[in-house]
Amino acid sequence: MVRVDIETIVMAAGPVPSLIVLRERCGKSDSTAPLRSLSIQTGSFEAAAISRGIDSGRAECPITHDLLLDTVDALGAKLERIEIVRAEPPVFYATVVVLADGSEHRIDARPSDAIALAVRSNAPMFVEDDIMNRLGTVSAHAEEVDDEQEFEKFDEFVHTLSPDDF
């Protein structure tokens, strides 16, 4: 398994899917190795739920992801981690791993829901090695890329997209 963090969320509207871009964490053994990123398509509401979990934490009135985490907590369990376990592009499959009474429980989930839960609970996120090897793209370290260049590259990329690309 490869440990990942959210690199960015690209919000879209209408029929165009949003993207969640996960980037592998820098390995301790070789910090100069290029990092890989994995893009997962999702709906705009799902992307907004993840973004809301990152940006503002809990809503005044709990939304579904908050409610589920409150339930897990009330039962004395803990969201241990989430895993992206299978991919049949453009569809990805995830597992939420919950620790309760000393036992691990693996629950099937959509990646967007699993990620939304992870960001709210600070649970680590992982991607199967095979998925990252097949579908990950090599990217430069974020620190080495000038922000202006990054925005220009992204702008160029966005202008080349059409709805048929998704």
PLM ranges: what are they?
Residues M1-F166:
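Divalent-cation
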